[in-house]
Structures are given as structure tokens and as C-alpha cells.
Amino acid sequence: MTYWTSEDNVAGKPGTALFIILPTIGCYRYRIGQACYMCSYPTAAPKVKWTQEAIVNYVKEALEKIEGTEGPFAVRMFTSGSFLDNGELKPETRRKIFEILAEMDNVEEIVIESRSELVRYEAVKELAEIVPDKHFEVAIGLETANDDVADVSINKGNTFADFVKAAEITHKAGAKVKTYLLLKPIFLSERDGVEDAKESIIKAEPYTDTFSINITDIQKGTLYERLWEKKEYRPPWLWSAVEVLIWAKRKFPNKRILSDPVGAGSKRGPHNCLTDYDRVIGKAIKKFSATQDLSYIENLKPECRDRWEYIVENGLLDWQLVTW
């Protein structure tokens, strides 16, 4: 397991995020053979189960990376599953972790992840009460507000109504909601992927404090990888991500719009024409995400943009493309 720091947006201003991958047993959907089609994260879960005490000690070790350092810092904890799943983290383990974070003045934001159906009022409330002066978000993987896309293209296992219920519980319990959306699930054209993201943002906006646009990358051992290998799926164009981010920030200027383009400029990640400029765009997206300053992505050189525009305007499917 691992942890690292990266430039990021912290409670609405530029700062640094400490990302911690907690060594739990991973997502229960994966354990019952119903993993999301794009996700291989649970395969990285430890083969030997860690004790709850060892997990707490691991968090302490990770926090040493920012201890005594001037912030602001966000601590974002991932489990390759759900932080609120009692099968991964016991309630007392969650409390111990939050009690440690409560004592760190340089940590202004805390983010945990959970599937919708695992969000429970008491579980969120007790954590929110431990860190009343910090920006505490529960990140929920909505992926799309279209239930058909969620079922056929993602195998999500829950619905938009489930998300709404979880978001309302989270707010009532005293925490904020971060909504994960997946840009361009399989079986959608580039145009439909962009439109699905925009429509999902509109539907989820009343329940959301922060949007995180997850730009699809190809993870090993997934259905997405199999379709990609057969040239029936192409990761999103970076221009699609830029389009969605600019549109979202202009439409909802008071919402925090985040995105981390994993693998930008590589064949497995979001890319345009696989030139060096793809990585420039990827870095610009990260700067926008950290600062919320649209100028980083509004003034990009339109390299390869004409190809993207042709594909989007004509609604071409990935298997119809000659070049990737």
C-alpha cells in the first residue's frame, strides 16, 4: 500500500493533498463477483488481512509526511472500497483515525469514499462531530445519473435515487458531498460521453458540494481493457474533459469542480493525438483543479482539436475511428 502528496484544492483554495490508500480487504462488490466494469482497484487489496490496529498505525505513518509542515492540507483516504463499510473498517477504527486528524491544525479538509448504500446517518454523524471545524466530505461514486448507463456500462449496482438518499443523509449528518462522475463509460460515443457527464452534473448539482470528474483510464483485468484491446473503446479525448470542466465551472461557479487526469497523454489514459502537448493539457487540468482558475484550460493551443470536433459533431463510435 502507499501514500503520496500532490498539489490540490483544499477547502476551496490551493494547497496540498495527502492521499492514503488504506490496506483493507477492498470493495464488497468485487468480493461477491460484481465489480464495476472499469475498476481494478480491489485487486490491489492485501492478500493477507491487516488488523484494524495495523491500519491505524499505517495512517499514523502516512501522516508523518505532513506532520509539522505548513498547510493547508487535505487528507483523502481511499480503501479500494468504502470507508464506511464495517467489513473493511470497524467503527472504532474510523473514530481513531478521525481523532488523530482532529488534532492536526494543518489539515483543513478530510475526504473519505463510500458507495451509496453504505452511507449511514450515525456513521457519518459521529465522524463529523469529531472534526467539526474541518471541511469533511463523503465522496460517493455516482459515475452517471443515467440508471441505464450505470447498469449496462458500469455495473454500478445502485441507482441515482440511491445516490440522492446517501447525499441527503450525509448533509443531515453534518458532512459535505463530493460526487464522482465517470467521463465516457463504455458503449457511449465521445459525444454521448460528454453529454452524459453534463446531464449528470445538472441532475446531481442540488445534492453536491464538490464534483470530481474522473476521466476514464484503462485498468488491467477489466472489461474496459478487453474492449480497448479489441479497439472497440478509446479513452476520452482530453478535449472532452476540458469541454466538461469549462462548461461545469461556468454553469455552477460556486461549486468546486475537480479532476485528476490519470495517465493523461498515454494510450491507456485520456489523450488527444498522443503528442507531448497532451501532457501539457493534463498538467493544465490539474492546475485548474487546484486553483479553480479557468484561465489554465481556456487558453490552450487547439492542437488536434479539429479531429475531436469532427468526431463529436458526427457522433462517431470508437470502433468507427481509423486513428486513436
From Swiss-Prot:
Keywords: 4Fe-4S, Iron, Iron-sulfur, Lyase, Metal-binding, S-adenosyl-L-methionine, tRNA processing. It comes from the Archaea. One of its GO terms (molecular function) is metal ion binding. Binds 1 [4Fe-4S] cluster. The cluster is coordinated with 3 cysteines and an exchangeable S-adenosyl-L-methionine. It holds the Pfam family Radical_SAM. Forms a robust complex with the archaeosine synthase alpha subunit ArcS, likely an alpha(2)beta(2) heterotetrameric structure. It is an enzyme of class 4 (lyase). Belongs to the radical SAM superfamily. RaSEA family. Its cofactor is [4Fe-4S] cluster. Radical SAM enzyme involved in the synthesis of archaeosine, a modified nucleoside present in the dihydrouridine loop (D-loop) of archaeal tRNAs. Catalyzes the cleavage of the C(epsilon)-N bond of the lysine moiety of q0kN15-tRNA, leading to the formation of archaeosine at position 15 in tRNAs. This is Archaeosine synthase subunit beta. The lineage of its organism: Archaea, Methanobacteriati, Methanobacteriota, Thermococci, Thermococcales.
